[in-house]
Amino acid sequence: MNTLSYKTISVNKETAKKEWVVIDASDQVVGRLCSKVAKLLRGKYKPTFTPHVDCGDNVIIINAAKVVFSGKKETDKVYTRYTGYPGGQRFNTPAELRKKEGGVERIIRHAVKGMLPKGPLGRSLLYNLYIYEGTEHKHEAQKPKTIDINQYK
């Protein structure tokens, strides 16, 4: 056998087979859920993974309002943001964010963003993530398949 004939397969944007998947986030720990979602967005579970190409799946998270934190993070963890004005540093705990509209989405999106590559590719991968607090989503036309996130490492 000629080992030089084996070429590494590199996927590009046109040949990447992107799928739509639905994940039920009920009673899932935020960090563990988001690390698996980040791998799905990146395409790490596919045999054709290419580091510099968007070859991951489009991920829809439903029941995001039912995610849980381990330990006392619900009350002790602090999210910091800055308004842009002097003295405009704001602090929120996950318990406070849950009360606000879109707060649970911000919690999950913040966690996934930290687990994706920093740079243009990571920012574009974040557009493939759709988060809904209830059971309904508006992507039925894409025929997403429901997966059990607990089967992934």
PLM feature segments, named:
Residues M1-H110, P120, K143-K153:
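Ribosome large-subunit tunnel/peptidyl-transferase-proximal elements
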Residues I108-R109, K113, L126:
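Hydrophobic, well-ordered secondary-structure segments
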Residues G122-Y132:
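C-terminal structural segments of small proteins and small subunits
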Residues I131-E140:
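Short, highly charged C-terminal tails/helix-capping segments
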